[in-house]
Structures are given as structure tokens and as C-alpha cells.
Amino acid sequence: MTKARCNPLWQPIPCPLSDIEGLESWLGDMAAQGLVPVTIGQNFARFRCSQPKAVRYRLNAKPAPETFLESAPGTPDGEERALAQECGWYYVTAVGDFFLYACEDSDAPELNTDPQVQALSLRYAKRQVFAPAGLLAYWLVTFWVRYAMGVWHTPVIDFVELGWLSFCYLGLLAAALVSVVHNTVLLYRFSARLTRGAEPERHKNWRKGAGRYLVGRVLAALLFVLTIVWTFAGSAMEKSRHGSIPLEDYTAPLPFATLDDYAGQPTALDADAAPAASFVLVQRLPLAPTFIKYEAHGQAGANGLRGALYVEYYECITPQLAQTMYREGKTNGLHNFPETAADAANGSIYCRTLVDGNKVLRVLLFQYQEEQIPLQELEAICKSGFAASGESA
């Protein structure tokens, strides 16, 4: 053992904590290299240096709490420790829902001599490892119920507009599901082996699959950090309208009717509106390679159109996705737009969702002038340049 390695060090755990046989075998191999565990967390274990020696490690399931409101003990009680010491074993540390014991005497009996009794002791650990699965299932059902009841109005539109961040959320959900299923299968398979009366595998090849497991954990951690950073950065960019162009500076043609088109003449943008309130934002999204967000506040002449126009235009990757977004927009037209519906008390709201192939157009127009544009004229203007079908949302 070199001097550089004599300080306490951390090592990544190469298998899930629910892989009892793999974890016990790995700790035994580390002891053979002169590394004795001090504490074991979810992903890393802390070791201290010692002389290389043969050490057996065994994980004992924590006793189940007496009531639902109580938690499992953090350390074994005196009676359990005394019984272990009589057999030549000593307590090391807690590992999740287990207590870790070690024995340096090769002639000492096993800590657990009856596999079926050991299987019964795993009941609490099995409930604990299954708890995240139940929580995930609860949230998935909750989201589905919210969508079915109309509480979550536009999940597909939200998913498209979030861009790559949506796939980060999906990746985290998939990683959580895989982890929960993997841990549950490992522990239940181990319990079934003990129930049959078979002895645990004392020298399991933990190296098989260790690289794949560690790479998966690293990727999941990186994805989690990326999602957190991206979420906060995206929220800040949305508030600052990062990448948007003031409407007066935007000269490229737009594939939909603008505020000038509805007014029938050039409009003077409202200088009293929030800074950069009138803007155009063009983005490339994974599911909508062309996404244009348009917002304009203004008035045309003394008696012309006075109001605000909000437009979202998508060119989706498939017509099927466009149809789904169209159905959501048709049913929930006012959602996902600025919350200015209260101002309609002094005017009127025109809301429209159109679809044409892989293109979707969502329009929200507020009018506040005394002589308002008739609905038929609004319909004709909205459809101009956009050959679409659909009904007003």
C-alpha cells in the first residue's frame, strides 16, 4: 500500500445497493486490497487503508418499524450486536435498509444460517425498494387524470415548446423507472432464492455489468444537472425573451396574418406597453423545426383597430403531431397565451386554431376599439396565406 493511498478515499459503488450478493462480494474484494469500508452511501463508499486480508461481509435487513409513522432504526440494537459478536461478527455501518456486518475469522459460522428466515427478514426492505415504484406510478396516474379532466390543458403543445428540455425530463423519468424496476427485480429475485432454501451466492462476479451500471449512473447524474441548469436558464431566457427581435426591426415575411393585416393598414406600436412587448421570436425545436412566436400591441389610425395580437406558428415534423396540437388548441384556445382575458370586458376576443398538413397556427386577437372588425372578416384575414381547415376554438 503506497503512502498516497493511505488517506481515506471514496470509491464508486459498482452495483445497486439492492444487489446484496454483488455488494457483499465487492466489499470482500476491496478488503483483500487493504480497503476497509467506513461509510456507504447511495453511490459512493468511503474506505480507510488497512492490511490486505480476507474479510466476509454480510448485509442484514433492518427490522421493520412497529407503526407506519416510525422509521427503521439507524443502528442495530444491543441485542442484535451481541448475537453477532457471539458468532464472530461485528457491526460496520448502515447501508440503506440494511446493517453491514464483517467477520475476519474464516472458521466463524455464517451470520444467517437459515435462508428462509433471512427471506422473511427482507419484507421491510422489499417494501422500501418498491415504494419509489408506487410513487412514480402515482404521479403518472395523476398527470393522466389531470389531462383527462382537462386540468392540464395542453401537454403536447407544452412538450413541443419546451424543446430539448422535454427530452431531458423524459430521460430522467426513464432513468428513474429503469432504476426502480432493476432494484425491485434484484431484491425480489434474491428473496425468492432464499425462500426456496438456496444459499446466497457468496462470491458473485460483481464486475459483470459494473461498467454498464457506472456509466448509466454517471449519465443519469449529468442529465439531472443539465436539466436543472437548463430549466433555470430557460426560465430566465423566456422572461427576458432571449433571441427575440423587436417587431419594428423584423423585415422577413411571416406565414400568417399580422396586426397590420387585421387592421388593413400600418399600425403604430403601443409605446406604453412593456419593453419589447411587440416582437418576433423564431426558433428551431426538435419536434417543430420552424417555430415562430409573434406578439404585437398597437393602433391603426384614430378610429382603426386598437388591440393586441398573439400568434404561435409551428411546422411540425409529422402531420399527426400537428393534428394532435390542433385538437388541443381547438379545445383550449385561451390557454398558453398571456393572461389578459380580463381586458376583454372593454372589447372582444378572437381565438382561432388552424391546421394544414404539418403546420399549426394559433391566433389570439384582442380588440378594444368601438367599431370592431366583424367575425367573418376576421376569419377571412386569419385564413389568408394559410390554407387551413378547422373550427374556431
Language-model features and meaning:
Residues 142, 157-196:
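Membrane-embedded alpha-helical segments of integral membrane proteins
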Residues 203-239:
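Internal/C-terminal transmembrane anchor helices
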